[in-house]
Amino acid sequence: MGKQLAIFISYLFHPLWMPLYVMLMFWNINAKAMFISNDVVWLYILLVVFINTLLIPVLLFWMMKRLKIIESLHLDSQKDRFYPFAIIGIFYLTTWYVFNSIEIFTYLSLVFVLAAILVFFALAINFFWKISIHSMSMGAMSTAVLYLAAVHFIDEVWPVYLIFILSGLVGYARLKLKAHSSSQVYIGYILGTLVVSIFFFTLL
């Protein structure tokens, strides 16, 4: 894998994209199971998620960079990660509140509770160690796909294979860019998997 491809993969599967990807996945394979079959409603959901979890946080990060609160938008250092992680967690909780207030979106709102838990977990770890949030988010996504496939009896197995292949590519890309050590990548993935597994287990 070349450096440019590793950079592209890292941007394409940046953790900030993950809530939007999860919503697209729900729209594609699980709409009827969540009693939301209207495409216009799904477009509203995607718009809210895009604004709350991607657009506004990115603009705030850019402002922090301009104000020299953080040194880099890549959040390479542990110091740079504190405020962005806290902001992301708050916006995830805000998105949860918006969706949870509408009855048919209650199931969807759990995604953002889980996302907030993961972010604050990463924030706590960041005080003493730099963990790969790319790997953590891919571990969370892998477990979520397995959960959906098992609980909602999804016949297609390709999403399961695909997410594990993508997880491997993302992890390798982070190592290729020397953004993390192998232990930071592996433990990030394991922690993402464990947190989501425990969360889903409490729902059963």
Label every model-predicted segment.
Residues 30-40, 69-73, 101-104, 204:
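Membrane-interface helix termini and inter-helical loops of multi-pass transporters
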Residues 1-6:
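Short, Lys/Arg-rich, polar N-terminal cytosolic tail immediately upstream
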Residues 10-30:
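The first (N-terminal) embedded transmembrane alpha-helix
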Residues 9, 71-87:
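Juxtamembrane helix-capping/reentrant segments at transmembrane boundaries
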Residues 83-103, 125-127, 131:
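C-terminal halves and exits of single transmembrane alpha-helices
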Residues 40-55, 114:
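Alpha-helical transmembrane segments
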Residues 105-204:
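Membrane-embedded catalytic cores of phosphoryl/pyrophosphoryl-handling enzymes
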Residues 15, 19-20, 53-62, 89-96, ...:
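Transmembrane alpha-helical segments of multi-pass membrane transport proteins and ion-pumping complexes
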